[in-house]
Amino acid sequence: MNVQLILRSLTYKEEQRVIIRPIGERVLLKHQKKEEVTKGGIYIPESARQEKKEGIVIAVGTFEDGKELPLKKGDHVIYGGYQADEIEIDDEKYIFVDFKDILATVVEE
């Protein structure tokens, strides 16, 4: 079963309820923002910030045989790879990542 994301508006449409469901072995992530200030309080200019490849799982697709991918909504993941399709909804950045590019889940103890 796919996890579904219901959004109230897209940047290119007026208030409309939509369901976004990843197709195939893809995962929809809410992109984790880059740090703007260090823990010591030093501001990091945008030109010096490295892209943080972490996100929160919003929705997952399925394997070719229909079985669920071993991720669930809310999982914190680290991903790699060079290909990710970005979308922006209500000023929030979301990305579609291939499941094979998910490197790890982050579990806080």
Curated annotation (Swiss-Prot):
InterPro entries listed in its UniProt record: Chaperonin_GroES (IPR020818), Chaperonin_GroES_sf (IPR037124), Chaprnonin_Cpn10_CS (IPR018369), GroES-like_sf (IPR011032)
Gene3D superfamilies found in the cross-reference section: GroES chaperonin
Single GO cellular component term: cytoplasm
SUPFAM superfamilies assigned: GroES-like
SMART domains the UniProt entry points to: Cpn10
UniProt xrefs under PROSITE patterns: CHAPERONINS_CPN10
Source organism superkingdom: Archaea
UniProt keyword terms in alphabetical order: Chaperone, Cytoplasm
Pfam families: Cpn10 (PF00166)
Principal cellular location given in the protein's record: cytoplasm
GO biological process: chaperone cofactor-dependent protein refolding
Molecular function GO terms recorded: ATP binding; metal ion binding; protein folding chaperone; protein-folding chaperone binding; unfolded protein binding
Described function: Together with the chaperonin GroEL, plays an essential role in assisting protein folding. The GroEL-GroES system forms a nano-cage that allows encapsulation of the non-native substrate proteins and provides a physical environment optimized to promote and accelerate protein folding. GroES binds to the apical surface of the GroEL ring, thereby capping the opening of the GroEL channel.
PANTHER family documented for this protein: 10 KDA HEAT SHOCK PROTEIN (PTHR10772), 20 KDA CHAPERONIN, CHLOROPLASTIC (PTHR10772:SF63)
Family, per entry: Belongs to the GroES chaperonin family.
Subunit (UniProt): Heptamer of 7 subunits arranged in a ring. Interacts with the chaperonin GroEL.
Protein name, per record: Co-chaperonin GroES
Provenance organism: Methanosarcina acetivorans (strain ATCC 35395 / DSM 2834 / JCM 12185 / C2A)
